[in-house]
A protein has these predicted regions:
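Intrinsic disorder in cytosolic terminal tails and internal cytosolic loops
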Residues: 163-204
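Structural signature of the two symmetry-related core transmembrane helices
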Residues: 44-59, 150
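Short amphipathic helix-loop junctions that connect adjacent transmembrane helices
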Residues: 1-14
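Loop-to-transmembrane helix entry/capping segments in MFS-fold secondary transporters
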Residues: 12-13, 106-118
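Intracellular juxtamembrane helix-capping segments at the cytosolic ends
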Residues: 92-106
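C-terminal ends and interior cores of transmembrane alpha-helices
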Residues: 52-73
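Helix-to-loop junctions at the C-terminal end of transmembrane segments
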Residues: 29-41, 137-138
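A membrane-interface helix-boundary motif in multi-pass transporters
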Residues: 135-153
Length: 204
């Protein structure tokens, strides 16, 4: 992002500002996006987030293009900052969403291995992404930065739609939740065959 901002003739202050806004908005968005993903199907949240990020990246391209129009016609950087923040809110929680979705389909003893594998894949993307993005920027211009992000997020969104069609949502295999009335007694809980036995305290 800093390289893109420098190529677009942003000042040093503007470059530091967009970098700060991208990081802080992405960090804050972890909480509301995580809460929403706990209430609804995570794959739907991933789909909305990826396509939302792609849409806001497109708007960012448009807003940057209007900033360099003649006086009286051009827009300020305000809208670019707004679209950048909206993009960050949709994009940066993606790793957490995918990790949480993965944990929904595996047992608890595989959480660490799954997290390590996803972190490795994330690292490969962090290494190859800037290189591939720079090639696209050299090919089509500075806006290749956001074009690359649009393509990348759309691919994730399309894959999520594909997975939703071939695999239904299921509960966590470690979950032992059973819906019971509020008036149930402790005896009713003990009669549930899926409830783990509770050890009686030793008498002194």
């Amino acid at each position: 992002l800093a390289v893109y901002a420098a190529a677009m003739n942003f000042s040093i202050f503007d470059i530091s500002l967009v970098t700060f806004m991208l990081a802080i908005s992405g960090a804050i968005s972890q909480y509301p996006v995580g809460y929403i993903s706990d209430k609804f199907d995570r794959r739907k949240v991933i789909i909305y987030s990826t396509f939302g990020a792609a849409i806001f990246a497109f708007f960012a391209i448009f807003s940057v293009g209007t900033m360099y129009l003649p006086d009286g016609l051009g827009s300020s950087k305000f809208w670019f900052y707004i679209f950048l923040i909206a993009f960050s809110v949709c994009s940066l929680p993606m790793f957490s969403l995918i990790l949480a979705h993965t944990n929904d389909f595996i047992t608890r003893d595989k959480f660490v291995a799954a997290g390590a594998s996803l972190q490795f894949a994330f690292g490969l993307g962090a290494i190859s992404g800037p290189f591939l993005c720079s090639l696209l920027m050299d090919l089509i211009g500075n806006n290749g930065f956001f074009v690359f992000l649009i393509i990348f997020h759309c691919l994730i969104g399309v894959f999520a739609v594909y997975r939703m069609k071939i695999r239904p949502s299921e509960e966590n295999p470690d979950s032992q939740f059973v819906a019971v009335p509020t008036t149930i007694t402790p005896v009713g809980m003990e009669l549930n065959p899926t409830t783990e036995p509770i050890e009686e305290p030793e008498k002194i």
